[in-house]
A protein has these predicted regions:
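Catalytic-core region of carbohydrate-active enzymes that cleave or remodel glycosidic bonds
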Residues: 275-353
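Sec-dependent N-terminal signal peptides
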Residues: 2-12
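A short small-residue
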Residues: 138, 143-156, 195-196, 264-272, ...
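Non-cysteine beta-strand/loop elements that form the S-adenosyl-L-methionine
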Residues: 189-192, 261-265
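Non-catalytic accessory regions flanking glycosidase/transglycosidase catalytic cores in CAZymes
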Residues: 14-189, 205-235, 254-258, 297-303, ...
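Short, solvent-exposed loop/turn segments at secondary-structure boundaries
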Residues: 201-205, 274-279
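Conserved radical SAM core fold
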Residues: 45, 74-77, 129, 193-199, ...
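Substrate-binding cleft/loops of secretory-pathway carbohydrate-active enzymes
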Residues: 233-263, 307, 311-334
């Protein structure tokens, strides 16, 4: 059977029709269900009523076990959510500098996942205030429309004590094993930081490598059979981002640091053209493909799983269309249509590489 669809714009006289041909008799094979990873900035919304409801719905809709990834799981604060911010207060220090661990808020987040029968993909970050090399200012100041001049502050800096940082990571994994069981936590993925080639990391690439070594070793010390990886860089189609990913893999190749999966991010770039939103699918696919090429160039790592821990039409979930007009794509059928095309394109790239 051959189906031919004709789509015409609203201004029929001014525009030429677009012809889309669909051959329903041609079988391409099973479409793998690899869209079971979801993420967000504000971890404290996880256990809010709507957060719990949404996570349960995602779990029920998916044929594969859903994974959830959230930012700010280790940051200092009272747990109050805000735009692109959250906190768990898992780590503070007493007057003598002795570590104090408090699992109350982190448990609330992870318990919500467990109750909904989803798995966390733990993004290990960001820096607790007591461990930051630049602790003040610490809480970001940002709202839609603002620049990010006062966003990447104390929580984005390297640790002032790598031994204390390593012990914190060890205690987090150890606590998870004690609470949820070795069998479950073995199946979790632990990702070191987020987008260290950008503002989320106020250190050098070499300092990130050091952070990765310390963090990955702590994860494996607590549970050798779980999975740790990174570097969660964004936009490998850009030369700077590509260089960061390459140097990280070169570092792991030389040092032998644990690396069970490789993660990076692919982003589109919508804009407004002639009064309508035009999506930037080519950029997201270019990021995806360049990352594939970089990983493939390392014989040691070319067979490792690649996880796109963020793959989106654009990069700011908190940026509404009221302030950022290109993001109006979210308010209609353009969004799901884009995602279907993006995932199909990424799967084709996977087959090619």
């Amino acid at each position: 059977m051959r189906l031919v669809l004709f789509f015409l714009s609203a201004s029929l006289l001014a525009q030429q029709p677009v012809h889309i041909r669909v051959n329903a008799s041609q079988k391409l094979g099973t479409f793998p269900s690899n869209w079971n990873l979801f993420g967000y900035d504000e971890p404290n919304y996880t256990y809010a009523p709507n957060g719990r409801k949404l996570i349960r719905e995602l779990s029920a809709l998916s044929s594969e076990r859903v994974q959830i990834r959230a930012h700010f799981l280790l940051t200092t604060g009272d747990g109050a959510p805000a735009f692109k911010w959250g906190s768990t207060n898992v780590y503070t220090e007493d007057a003598s500098g002795k570590p104090v661990y408090d699992w109350t808020i982190l448990d609330r987040i992870l318990d919500t996942y467990a109750q909904a029968e989803v798995s966390p993909l733990i993004e290990i970050g960001f820096m607790p205030k007591a461990l930051s090399t630049h602790p003040d200012p610490y809480v970001p100041v940002w709202k839609p429309g603002d620049k990010f001049d006062h966003y990447y502050v104390g929580w984005a800096y390297p640790p002032n004590n790598y031994d204390k940082w390593s012990e914190l990571v060890y205690q987090v994994v150890k606590h998870a094993v004690a609470k949820y069981g070795k069998a479950k936590v073995e199946g979790w993925n632990w990702e070191v930081w987020n987008e260290p080639n950008g503002g989320y990391w106020r250190g050098t690439p070499e300092e990130y490598d050091k952070l990765y070594d310390s963090t990955a070793a702590a994860v494996k010390r607590a549970l050798p059979t779980t999975h740790v990886g990174g570097p969660a860089t964004t936009g490998p189609a850009s030369p700077r981002a590509a260089a960061f990913l390459k140097q990280f893999l070169e570092h792991c190749e030389k040092s032998g640091a644990p690396l069970d999966f490789i993660s990076y991010h692919a982003k589109g770039r919508p804009d407004v053209t002639d009064g309508h939103v035009r999506m930037g699918l080519s950029k997201e696919l270019a990021d995806t493909e360049e990352g594939f090429k970089i990983v493939k160039s390392f014989t040691k790592f070319r067979n490792l799983p690649i996880i796109l821990t963020e793959a989106d039409p654009e990069g700011c979930a908190a940026c509404s269309a009221r302030v950022y007009p290109p993001n109006a794509y979210r308010n209609g059928t353009l969004y799901p249509a884009y995602e279907a095309a993006a995932y199909n394109g990424m799967l084709q790239l996977q087959e090619r590489h």
